[in-house]
Amino acid sequence: MAKPLTDGERRKQISVRGLAGLGDVAEVRKSFNRHLHFTLVKDRNVATRRDYYLALAHTVRDHLVGRWIRTQQRYYERDPKRIYYLSLEFYMGRTLQNTMVNLGLQNACDEAIYQLGLDLEELEEIEEDAGLGNGGLGRLAACFLDSMATLGLAAYGYGIRYEFGIFNQKIVNGWQVEEADDWLRYGNPWEKARPEYMLPVHFYGRVEHSPEGVRWLDTQVVLAMPYDTPVPGYKNDTVNTMRLWSAKAPNDFKLHDFNVGGYIEAVLDRNLAENISRVLYPNDNFFEGKELRLKQEYFVVAATLQDIIRRFKSSKFGCRDPVRTSFETFPDKVAIQLNDTHPALAIPELMRILVDVEKVDWDKAWEITKKTCAYTNHTVLPEALERWPVSMFEKLLPRHLDIIYAINQRHLDHVAALFPGDVDRLRRMSVIEEGDCKRINMAHLCVIGSHAVNGVARIHSEIVRQSVFKDFYELEPEKFQNKTNGITPRRWLLLCNPGLAETIVERIGEGFLTDLSQLKKLLPLVGDEALIRDVAQVKQENKVKFSAFLEKQYGVKVNPSSMFDVHVKRIHEYKRQLLNCLHVVTLYNRIKKDPTQAFVPRTVMIGGKAAPGYHMAKKIIKLVTSIGNIVNHDPIVGDRLKVIFLENYRVSLAEKVIPAADLSQQISTAGTEASGTGNMKFMLNGALTIGTMDGANVEMAEEAGAENLFIFGLRVEDVEALDRKGYNAHEYYDRLPELRQAVDQINGGFFSPREPDCFKDVVNMLLNHDRFKVFADYEAYVACQARVDQLYRNPKEWTKKVIRNIACSGKFSSDRTITEYAHDIWGAEPPALQTPPPSLPRD
């Protein structure tokens, strides 16, 4: 009888190293047909378009798994410091094309699919966006995952596998209507369920103090089931993991609560536990304070920390037994980055595990926690800051409330010792806010419990230091940093704008795709006639393509020779879509007043979602669609001005509209947009920016030269001065006839003849309580737009500025951002050693 295999031999038998890569066209075809038959159980007679998409997805996924396993093996062998990026949002978009691009498979797949009589682009369109985010925060997390994999960092994204992502937006009679985003309806070929790593998460219960320590008892348990999605780096054979948790009820859930007859009710009530991962809260920059949301925040943190500690304790290859019992080295092996305050409970939860479970003494546990955690602040808007009622914690997380009180007491003792007698400072710096309803300030908890706190653009980090966390900065100035946001050039150039990428590669090679600073090599070519021609031609092709898409999707005809003026982002008062509306109405009035004048034709596109409960944002959408209805059907205006609301703006739509844009609108009130990343995407794709000195616009102007952007409006210090003086919108309304005309038309029902009073509340807000000072910037904005028109009339000079902007956008790669995080915050340098491809032997 054959001798039984050793563990090592058995592992070699199922190793992926022996599998040949499927890079060539014939292999892709073969694999595609195999999946169509054996995975999907279809033949070409009955297969649907979705079957073809799934067959291709599985074919491409086959290329990932070897690298994925190999990457994880290598991490277990080398035991590098792990980076854990905790976020309640990951706005990933589609996966198929990104995976083909990062693995260098796109050409082979394109040819194979063509030979099979199918169209690759058509199949790509079938994939649902993974819309597990609201906007910038979630998309940043997705770009960061791409960069961490491309840099070879041992990084993991941890979040929630929402059954329903950000709602689908329909426009009905000009109003936003929300539809559920059932993105998992047809299954998700990119994820792998990992039931063997399912973990319990506790809620409610009571706290018992005894000589042996503290116990949290009589809790309700919900299980967290992990689903893993591969995150491939760009052509480096590294594949990292995004692990998303899904809530499952335990098998005995509620059964003991019922008498003999209650079995069916108990099974039906399992839904209550599983609701935790049901839906993404659709609020952007707004705190609502719902108990289910707090449950989501604790759920992801509790499951993730158990997973992190399991991996820390058994972090050598092939070993599931605990090998580390001491937590001394925990901060040397683990970095936890908190993406905003949503995962703030990681701080008290790590303390609970260390003190209650692992029996580490408090001071040591606190030192470990602080060295491990770091916090990124994403907003300065007061309504966005998370402040949870103490009463909710008392009920839901009683042990964590105790721990937060203890953290706060020690913190305040420290402050009192440094600033004796300064009672107001203690009040300002406390984690607990006193008042009618006692609240926990999660941002304060994050600052106290982290070794590093960063803002996301230089101007924002300055506001964080001087205003939002001024007292904390005075206490620990060395803790505060800036890390200007970035975007991945793989998705936001190579994937979405292959024509422009190719034009650049022809001039400077392809090194810029992993070192975006190399775009500087284009600077000497700014005046090169051939480059000017090629860049302009690519832009025109993108505009023609997007025009065809608009006609097909929305039945809207636009003139691709007009200026594409694009304003796409979440609908929010601070982002000032209303300022754009006032300019559009002003242009309309000018055309009507003198139709014989030479106007630069414009297609104004505005897109974005409004939070379902945000009345003013929904009114803004209605206003845009109403203005469009009048302007677009006015025969005197004709082709010179069109206003289009881009329905259901999402990652996959951004990938189409951004490469086609001529003008990028980034017009938030100075001091309100933390960074913005859409601004960077437009810059990289050859649009010029009209914007205020806010967020990353400031650094874009610094990189490219302010004369190569259209900068207008109040600066932060002007806004502050206006606040001190008192902002009076009526001054501008009375002084500026064009503004007054536009406002009166909106107020009087000119754009809403069937509902003349529709926009009275909008105008009332603008005149009497506009926090974001739309009228104060109107005059400068309209004048700046005239400069835009003037330059657009000179295509060559316009394109020169475009090339200069592209050449100066290198700073805004998320690779640069992540390299800075790794060096300055995580203490984990990107490795020089790449992961060998799965077909090479391990060293």
UniProtKB/Swiss-Prot annotation:
EC number: 2.4.1.1
Function according to Swiss-Prot or TrEMBL: Glycogen phosphorylase that regulates glycogen mobilization. Phosphorylase is an important allosteric enzyme in carbohydrate metabolism. Enzymes from different sources differ in their regulatory mechanisms and in their natural substrates. However, all known phosphorylases share catalytic and structural properties.
Organism: Bos taurus
GO biological process, one term: glycogen catabolic process
Ligand binding (pyridoxal 5'-phosphate): K569
Oligomer and partners: Homodimer. Dimers associate into a tetramer to form the enzymatically active phosphorylase A.
One GO CC term on file: cytoplasm
Site (Participates in a stacking interaction with the adenine ring of AMP): Y76
Residues under site feature: May be involved in allosteric control: Y156
N6-(pyridoxal phosphate)lysine: residues carrying this PTM: K681
Pfam family, one: Phosphorylase
Protein name as catalogued: Glycogen phosphorylase, brain form
Family: Belongs to the glycogen phosphorylase family.
Cofactors named for this entry: pyridoxal 5'-phosphate
Catalytic activity: [(1->4)-alpha-D-glucosyl](n) + phosphate = [(1->4)-alpha-D-glucosyl](n-1) + alpha-D-glucose 1-phosphate
